[in-house]
Amino acid sequence: MQKQRFCLDTTAITDSGVRKSLGATNISESAEKIMDIISKARVKLDISCHIPYNTVYNELIGFLNREGCKNEIIIKVDTWLVKKTPNRYEIKIPSEILYEYIKDLRERINKGMRISENAMYETALEAYILKKPEEKNKDDVLNEVLSKTVNNFRDKYRNALRGGTLDSAPDLDVLLLAKELDAAVVANDEGIEKWAQRLGLRFVNAKDFPFILQEYLDMWGKK
């Protein structure tokens, strides 16, 4: 049987869906449960779980520290997750993938520009409708209109430019390391999932990952 390897994104440990699936009440409890399963899978089945260093590792540790996780959990992360920097200079990516990424990025930029233009028109229209000289002054109108428009703009702009694509170095490192190791990608991220498929990588949803490892362990225990 081929050795099983997994490459973890931060969301493999921190995602709220993971906590819910494990019945945990907080990130500290769910992280400890996941790390305990990972450690058993490593010792009993030689299943290795990797994390890109230092991008994703620092992101994960920073999140756990901000959530007040106890030091024992950090130690488990350091012990059972294999930290490795992707060999960015040696990993070969088909040029078609790069072409698709640039094309996708260009389309998102254009969409973001259209959203920006629409937001300007909406702001001007709202200001015109709301402004009543006898009732409101200029600052009141601007504050009322801009706060609403800016909030709507942020949501639409974020979705247009970041939803379903790679928008950070840690995201890319997860895919590069998984390709280098021929490992399955573990995440709850639409962009990582989409580009993992394009690269021909195995993908495991973060909320399913602990139960997949547990299934391996249960089968091993029946031998």
Swiss-Prot record:
Catalysed reactions, as listed in the record: Endonucleolytic cleavage of RNA, removing 5'-extranucleotides from tRNA precursor
Keywords annotated in UniProt: Endonuclease, Hydrolase, Nuclease, tRNA processing
EC number: 3.1.26.5
Domain of life: Archaea
Pfam families: PIN_5 (PF08745)
GO biological process, one term: tRNA 5'-leader removal
Entries under InterPro entries matching the protein: RNA_free_RNase_P (IPR014856)
GO molecular function: ribonuclease P activity
Ranges that cross the membrane: none
Enzyme category, top tier: hydrolase
Similarity section: Belongs to the HARP family.
Described function: RNA-free RNase P that catalyzes the removal of the 5'-leader sequence from pre-tRNA to produce the mature 5'-terminus.
Protein name in UniProt: RNA-free ribonuclease P
Taxonomy of the source species: Archaea, Methanobacteriati, Methanobacteriota, Methanomada group, Methanococci
